Amino acid sequence: MKCNDKMVVIMGATGSGKSSLSVDLALHFKAEIINSDKMQFYDGLKITTNQSTIEDRRGVPHHLLGELNPEAGEVTAAEFRVMAAEAISEITQRKKLPILAGGSNSYIHALLAKSYDPENYPFSDHKGSICSELKYDCCFIWIDVDQSVLFEYLSLRLDLMMKSGMFEEIAEFHRSKKAPKEPLGIWKAIGVQEFDDYLKMYKWDNDMDKWDPMRKEAYEKAVRAIKENTFQLTKDQITKINKLRNAGWDIKKVDATASFREAIRAAKEGEGVAEMQRKIWNKEVLEPCVKIVRSHLDQPINYYYYYFYLLKRFLSLN
C-alpha cells in the first residue's frame, strides 16, 4: 500500500457480518478497524447494540467502539467526520490499512464525502444531495444477504440476544441512567425505546414463570416491536447503499446468503457456530473480498487522493 492513501469500507444491513469480515480482512492486510455504527460508539448496552467482544476482535485494534459516555449527548455525523478522520490519520501514520465497518450510512457519507454540509441530509429525495467525490481512495464492499434469509437469521439472533441478557441489560440501563427529554445517542438504540413502556409499567423481575398473562404479553409485544424495527432498519440501510451506488460510489456487492442459510440451519439444530458455516463464509465471502481488496491496493496511486493526503499532513503540521 503506497502513500497511506487507501482504505476499505465494509457496508451492509445490520446482522450481515460486517464486523466479522472487517476482522478477517484486518488479519490479512495489517489493518485497524474504525467503527461506523452510531449506536456502538457508546459505552454500555454491548449486547443490545451487538458490539464485538474482545474475543471477536481477535487482537485487531478497534476505534470509536464502546468508547464514549452515553450521558454526554449524541455524536453527530459532523462530529464523526472529524473523529474518524483523526483515527484514519493515526492508523496510516502507523503504516496500517484503515478499515471502516458499520451500518450508519449517513455517517459513512459524512466521513468520506469531499464536500459535506451538516444541514443537508444526503439521503433526501433532493437530487444531488449525495456527494460523489470522496476524500479517500476507498475500496467499498457490500455484504448482501437475501432479505428473507436475513430476516429469519435476525429473528433467531434476537432470541439468542434475549437469552444472553439483553433484557436485563436494558432494564439496568433504564435504572442507572437519566433519560434525556428526547431520545439521544444510545437511547435511540433498537430495544431501548421498545421496552420503555414495559419498564415504566412493571418493576424489575426476571422470573418470567411468575408473570401474569398481561405482563407476558407486554414483554412479547416489545420483543415483536424490536424485530419489526430491526427488519425496517435493514430495508432502510439497503435503500441508502443503493442511493450511494446510484450517485457513483463504486460499491462491490458480495453475496453471503449461503453462509447465513447454514447459520440458520445450525442454530435450529442446536449446533452453535457450525464449522460448515465458517467454510462457506471463507469460500463465498472472505476469499472474494480478499481478492477485491488486494486488487484495490495493487492499483496505481490515485494522485488526487495522494495530494489531498499531503495537504492534510501539511496543514496538521502548521
Curated annotation (Swiss-Prot):
GO BP annotations, alphabetical order: cytokinin biosynthetic process; tRNA processing
GO cellular component: cytosol
Catalysed reactions listed for this entry: dimethylallyl diphosphate + ADP = N(6)-(dimethylallyl)adenosine 5'-diphosphate + diphosphate; dimethylallyl diphosphate + ATP = N(6)-(dimethylallyl)adenosine 5'-triphosphate + diphosphate
Disruption phenotype: No visible phenotype, due the redundancy with other IPTs.
Tissue and organ expression note: Expressed in immature seeds with highest expression in the chalazal endosperm.
Record function comment: Involved in cytokinin biosynthesis. Catalyzes the transfer of an isopentenyl group from dimethylallyl diphosphate (DMAPP) to ATP and ADP, but not to AMP. Has no DMAPP:tRNA isopentenyltransferase activity.
Record protein name field: Adenylate isopentenyltransferase 4
Organism from which the protein derives: Arabidopsis thaliana (Mouse-ear cress)
Gene responsible for this protein: IPT4
